[in-house]
């Protein structure tokens, strides 16, 4: 009896002990994460090396506000708003600073040794590699320099002169198609600019046009455009470590579009390499270069040419078209330059159109207000840290210049939200003489800046000159705020831009 009573007492005590342990475990499960978050918040707000930088408190303690704005396609607009409120440097995440100054461009993107390496943890281009292969835009410094040496001859001024026929033929074809189609009503110029840009870069890359202007439903361009908005999901997955899950959950049309793009790139590349009498396209310079590339490197480079080469110029022309139509006095001034300078279509050479001062000013002003990449491509501060704009930033933190905010900043430009090409003309006593034009770098800056800058200017100059020469323009929906309602997904959303085109009757072919 005594033994039984003792055992009951022991079991009762054990039961109480287990209950106490369980309660403590449950309490710990609840309390410890809360305590961790609380300590993290306190650290980010008051103890972090970035604690002294201005910015919204919620963005300083968590990456989630950045993610939310990014997923909604409003990240560039939101960061512009933050710079308007807080100044030229803003803390936009617990471990990231955003800048809008020319000095930040020079330091972050221009410094070579040590280099500020690209942040490929989901803040910018994502994913960094596909199938283990990096692209020109995400490659490590030594490999990137090797690839640049291999392709530099293809983007030289000599190459550009030898490739003029590609630009002339495709811009002429665009004009003819627009003449045929404009009789039926307004045309979506966003689409047409993408089509002609794709034809030009495809012909330059492979010596064979893709036929997009002649066949607007061409599957290749549809495959690329289908991927544009998907990048925010890849950024989120890379940041929070669920790329495997995302790949499993990704809709079939997205994965198929990616596979289709690579397959078509490989097929075009194979045909070009095996061609008997190719013209002077990109590949002719690359294959003749002493810096030899393997097949996979050629495929990835070709993919970069197609995606980046077409998107930059098409976006630049779309933005400029809208801004000119919103500012008819500037459009009229451009008409006077183009129609006064050129007496016939034959006069419109690359050299001639790229020498048009007001046209060039319009292109620069268009890309200031509507930059091809409106956000930021952040870099990591190297080593133990660097001085940026007079303040020490420790190593390992992310920093970058936001293109949209920099171009729209009243600290950099007078009448910053207005379209004034005159600010780029270097006129004496100009009201814009104090503008910090170096704060705008639409093709990025430094050794990783866009290698196709001259090509893009040539393409945009020739195409826009011909459209101004051949047509009068009018917005179909003048009240439609096409620009401000566009989302940004690393690049612009590319909403339709409906324009009424009227052929000019007295042009000389």
Swiss-Prot record:
The answer to keyword Transmembrane helix applying to this record is yes
**Alphabetized InterPro entries for the sequence:** Cyt_P450 (IPR001128), Cyt_P450_CS (IPR017972), Cyt_P450_E_grp-I (IPR002401), Cyt_P450_sf (IPR036396), Cytochrome_P450_monoxygenase (IPR050121)
* GO CC, one annotated term: membrane
Please give the start and end residues of each transmembrane region. 25-45
Q: What is its EC number?
A: 1.-.-.-
Q: What's the cofactor? A: heme
Q: Which named protein is this?
A: Cytochrome P450 monooxygenase alt3
Q: Which organism is it from?
A: Alternaria solani
């Amino acid at each position: 009896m005594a033994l039984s009573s003792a055992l009951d007492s022991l079991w009762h005590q054990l039961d109480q002990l287990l209950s106490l342990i369980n309660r403590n475990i449950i309490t710990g499960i609840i309390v410890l994460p809360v305590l961790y978050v609380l300590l993290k918040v306190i650290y980010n707000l008051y103890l972090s090396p970035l604690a002294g930088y201005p910015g919204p408190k919620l963005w300083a303690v968590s990456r989630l506000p950045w993610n939310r704005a990014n997923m909604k396609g409003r990240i560039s607009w939101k960061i512009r708003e933050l710079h308007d409120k807080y100044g030229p440097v803003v803390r936009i995440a617990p471990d990231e600073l955003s800048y809008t100054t020319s000095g930040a461009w020079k330091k972050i993107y221009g410094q070579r040794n040590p280099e500020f390496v690209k942040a490929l943890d989901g803040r910018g281009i994502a994913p960094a590699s596909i199938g283990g292969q990096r692209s020109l835009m995400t490659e490590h410094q030594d490999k990137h320099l090797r690839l640049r040496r291999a392709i530099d001859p293809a983007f030289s001024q000599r190459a550009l002169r030898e490739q003029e026929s590609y630009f002339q033929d495709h811009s002429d074809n665009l004009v003819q198609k627009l003449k045929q189609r404009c009789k039926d009503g307004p045309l979506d110029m966003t689409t047409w600019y993408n089509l002609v840009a794709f034809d030009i870069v495809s012909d330059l890359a492979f010596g064979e046009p893709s036929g997009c202007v002649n066949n607007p439903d061409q599957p290749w361009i549809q495959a690329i455009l289908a991927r544009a908005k998907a990048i925010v999901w890849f950024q989120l997955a890379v940041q929070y470590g669920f790329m495997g899950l995302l790949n499993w959950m990704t809709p079939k049309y997205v994965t198929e579009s990616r596979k289709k793009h690579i397959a078509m790139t490989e097929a075009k590349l194979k045909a070009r390499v095996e061609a008997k009498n190719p013209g002077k396209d990109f590949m002719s310079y690359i294959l003749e270069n002493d810096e030899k590339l393997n097949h996979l490197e050629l495929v990835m480079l070709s993919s970069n040419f197609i995606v980046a080469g077409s998107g930059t110029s098409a976006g630049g022309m779309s933005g400029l078209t809208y801004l000119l139509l919103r500012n008819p006095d500037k459009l009229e001034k451009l008409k006077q330059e183009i129609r006064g300078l050129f007496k016939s279509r034959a006069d419109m050479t690359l050299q001639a159109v790229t020498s048009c001062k007001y046209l060039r000013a319009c292109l620069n002003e268009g890309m200031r207000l509507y930059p091809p990449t409106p956000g930021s491509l952040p870099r990591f501060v190297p080593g133990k840290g660097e001085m940026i704009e007079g303040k020490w930033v420790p190593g390992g933190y992310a920093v970058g210049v936001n293109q949209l905010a920099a171009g729209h900043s009243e600290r950099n430009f007078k009448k910053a939200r207005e379209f004034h090409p005159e600010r780029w003309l270097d006129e004496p006593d100009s009201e814009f003489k104090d503008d910090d034009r170096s704060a705008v770098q639409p093709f990025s800056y430094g050794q990783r800046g866009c290698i196709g800058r001259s090509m893009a200017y040539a393409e945009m100059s020739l195409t826009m000159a011909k459209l101004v020469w051949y047509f009068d323009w009018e917005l179909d929906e003048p009240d439609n705020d096409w620009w401000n309602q566009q989302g940004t997904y690393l690049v612009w959303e590319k909403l339709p831009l409906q324009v009424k085109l009227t052929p000019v009757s007295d042009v000389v072919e």
